[in-house]
């Protein structure tokens, strides 16, 4: 009987231990704490420059210096254009080198996915993506100027970005799930618009003058007490309307334009995050312009 009970407990403990190897976020009162190997982990990190991890030689040269600086974590860009140089063909050489060098120098890694957007622009998207502007449309200024910013309203843009990100996540899971060198991943980098506050493409205009999505209004209603004061003030200025276009609900100014753009960006990233979590459930986050 004792051996049988031990065997049953062993079967239950093994999955638990495997789960605890993955980093995760845990609420601690009003704050959120990063846990690595089941313990609180304070990131003493340094972030590489935008293109500092674009060659094996640079990675091998930089990582030993980071250890000597007393860091325990390095934030490293991962480039869509170098990960999928040809559509549907993936190269994870740089990712593998980052993980290998991090382990050799006793460092954890936070990857920054430079996908459809990096500092608003689509400069790290692959050439094949940039050249096919009909399939992967751009954002436009009010004056009608095409920007080197992929449209956040395009399903094709999302699918291409998400496919590459998912394949990359699968690879990380396959090579790092046991070691746990990669502790977090940032999706995109400083997403947002430049030159104008919102996209003026035909698709964007169509949605801007359409009713605010009920899902967004529902979120505002449910979280009214915890909304950012400026967000609450914008909504209040129009009488806390529950229906109407973006300008009817929030007013006609540049801040409404920004709220309008925040919605498709948030939906885009959340869809990528949901798929990524189903592949490899480690902490994901986003920063903003």
What does each model-found stretch correspond to?
Residues 1-4:
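Positively charged n-region of N-terminal signal peptides that target proteins for export
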Residues 9-18:
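Hydrophobic h-region of N-terminal signal peptides that target proteins for export
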Residues 18-71:
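N-terminal carbohydrate-binding accessory modules
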Residues 41, 49-53, 79-83, 115-119, ...:
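Solvent-exposed loop/turn segments at secondary-structure junctions
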Residues 42-44, 70-72, 103-109, 174, ...:
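Short, well-ordered coil/turn segments that N-cap beta-strands
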Residues 44-49, 75-77, 110-114, 186-188, ...:
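A cross-family glycoside hydrolase active-site/sugar-binding cleft signature
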Residues 58-133, 269-279:
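Aromatic-lined substrate-binding rim segments of carbohydrate-active enzymes
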Residues 125, 132-289:
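Polysaccharide-binding and catalytic clefts of secreted carbohydrate-active enzymes
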């Amino acid at each position: 009987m004792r051996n049988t009970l031990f065997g049953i407990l062993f079967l239950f403990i093994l999955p638990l231990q495997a789960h605890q190897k993955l980093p995760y976020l845990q609420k601690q009162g009003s704050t959120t704490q990063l846990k690595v190997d089941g313990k609180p982990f304070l990131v003493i990190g340094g972030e590489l420059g935008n293109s500092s991890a674009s060659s094996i030689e640079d990675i091998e040269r930089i990582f030993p210096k980071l250890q000597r600086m007393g860091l325990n974590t390095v934030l490293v860009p991962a480039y869509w254009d170098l990960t999928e140089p040809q559509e549907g063909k993936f190269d994870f050489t740089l990712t593998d080198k980052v993980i290998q060098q991090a382990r050799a120098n006793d460092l954890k890694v936070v990857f920054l996915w430079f996908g459809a957007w990096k500092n608003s622009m689509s400069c790290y998207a692959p050439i094949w993506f940039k050249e096919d502007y009909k399939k992967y449309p751009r954002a436009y200024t009010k004056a009608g100027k095409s920007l080197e910013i992929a449209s956040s309203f395009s399903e094709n843009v999302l699918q291409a970005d998400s496919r590459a990100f998912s394949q990359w996540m699968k690879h990380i899971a396959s090579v790092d799930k046991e070691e746990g060198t990669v502790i977090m991943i940032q999706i995109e980098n400083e997403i947002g618009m430049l030159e104008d506050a919102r996209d003026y493409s035909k698709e964007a205009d169509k949605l801007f003058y359409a009713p605010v999505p009920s899902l967004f209004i529902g979120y505002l209603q449910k979280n009214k007490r915890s909304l950012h004061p400026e967000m609450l003030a914008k909504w209040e200025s129009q009488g806390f309307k529950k229906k109407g276009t973006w300008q009817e609900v929030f007013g006609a100014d540049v801040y409404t334009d920004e709220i309008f753009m925040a919605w498709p960006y948030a939906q885009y990233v959340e869809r990528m995050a949901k798929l990524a979590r189903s592949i490899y459930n480690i902490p994901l986050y986003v920063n903003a312009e």
